[in-house]
């Protein structure tokens, strides 16, 4: 069988006809807060409100629905630790197909349970491998041995066409109010979303500049398209933005992105965390890290988008509540508002009071203090966390800490030590 490797806008239109009665048409919302913040018109495409709280359902449903009757009868497989697995599970139940979903053993129980919920009795989950790559190998072996069909999360034309239906919806919704977009921002992981969107927008809204956004710790598309001019596999990726942390983009998505994506932005993971918290507190939007990427990118484009009309794809909202402490910590670290030190503390009455009076500013707050008194020693080791009210107070804080203990260790600059705290 010949595998199709090219995509055009007609493929997206056909995909839309297949999925429109199953996939939710998510809102395209004007965002007053972001519009005022950046002095432009910002719209959000709310894929976090999709049935599975992510755009991945679009591609999964389209890719599975075009399979032959024989392939559907034999069943489908996928490997995923997140949103793609939920999209495949939802589709398997909707089409009454057998699906075997492989997930790493390290997958949070919440995500495993969500896949079970969406797939119900149609889905079998196999937890295997410590990493996604190990899990993928097992899935491919199982697929071949059982003559099933593997549903690729991004490097498949039918998957990409399904993701592209999001762009068709944006244009349909905006045309009602005669809105045209100058910029569209969307996250890049493996490249399926940006490829589908850019293909469709190039045909029907060529004036719209397509901006791909990646986490700075996993910018595989930027490295491939812009830096190396060939597909590369990153040696190491930061997996915090798990929905967009891919070491190697797809062959198909690489070719499409190279043709149609106008620019690439890399966003620090700490900035993503600040955006997640901002979206929740200011707009009551629960975005996962990958879902917040597009909005995070606006800060780097703030001069270019002034007076323009912009749309950001909020690609997903599957955020594990157990991660919120880490998200807050990463945000405070990025904003330079929270700082950790290891100090030698005098073991005598009144030492802590002296520290508070001599080191802390009037608005500084101690958020962590770990200390075990040892009567046989003159000093004891203390781990202390200090949160600032004003980021400009940092230099004075460091001076005061140094005066108190010249041998202090500033933990924020030591990734290994800092990782023990969160």
From Swiss-Prot:
Catalyzes the anaerobic formation of alpha-ketobutyrate and ammonia from threonine in a two-step reaction. The first step involved a dehydration of threonine and a production of enamine intermediates (aminocrotonate), which tautomerizes to its imine form (iminobutyrate). Both intermediates are unstable and short-lived. The second step is the nonenzymatic hydrolysis of the enamine/imine intermediates to form 2-ketobutyrate and free ammonia. In the low water environment of the cell, the second step is accelerated by RidA. The keyword Lyase applies. Homotetramer. InterPro entries: IlvA (IPR011820), Ser/Thr_Dehydratase (IPR050147), Ser/Thr_deHydtase_PyrdxlP-BS (IPR000634), TD_ACT-like (IPR001721), TD_ACT-like_sf (IPR038110), TrpB-like_PALP (IPR001926), TrpB-like_PALP_sf (IPR036052). The modification N6-(pyridoxal phosphate)lysine is found at residue 56. Pyridoxal 5'-phosphate binds at residues 83, 189-193, 315. Pathway: Amino-acid biosynthesis; L-isoleucine biosynthesis; 2-oxobutanoate from L-threonine: step 1/1. Its EC number is 4.3.1.19. Belongs to the serine/threonine dehydratase family. Disulfide bonds: none annotated. This is L-threonine dehydratase biosynthetic IlvA. CDD domains: Thr-dehyd (cd01562). Gene3D superfamilies: 3.40.50.1100, Biosynthetic Threonine Deaminase, Domain 3. One of its GO terms (biological process) is L-serine catabolic process. Residues 339-413 form the ACT-like domain. Keywords: Amino-acid biosynthesis, Branched-chain amino acid biosynthesis, Isoleucine biosynthesis, Lyase, Pyridoxal phosphate. PANTHER family: THREONINE DEHYDRATASE, MITOCHONDRIAL (PTHR48078:SF11), THREONINE DEHYDRATASE, MITOCHONDRIAL-RELATED (PTHR48078). It catalyses: L-threonine = 2-oxobutanoate + NH4(+). It comes from the Bacteria. The lineage of its organism: Bacteria, Bacillati, Bacillota, Bacilli, Bacillales. Signal peptide: none annotated.
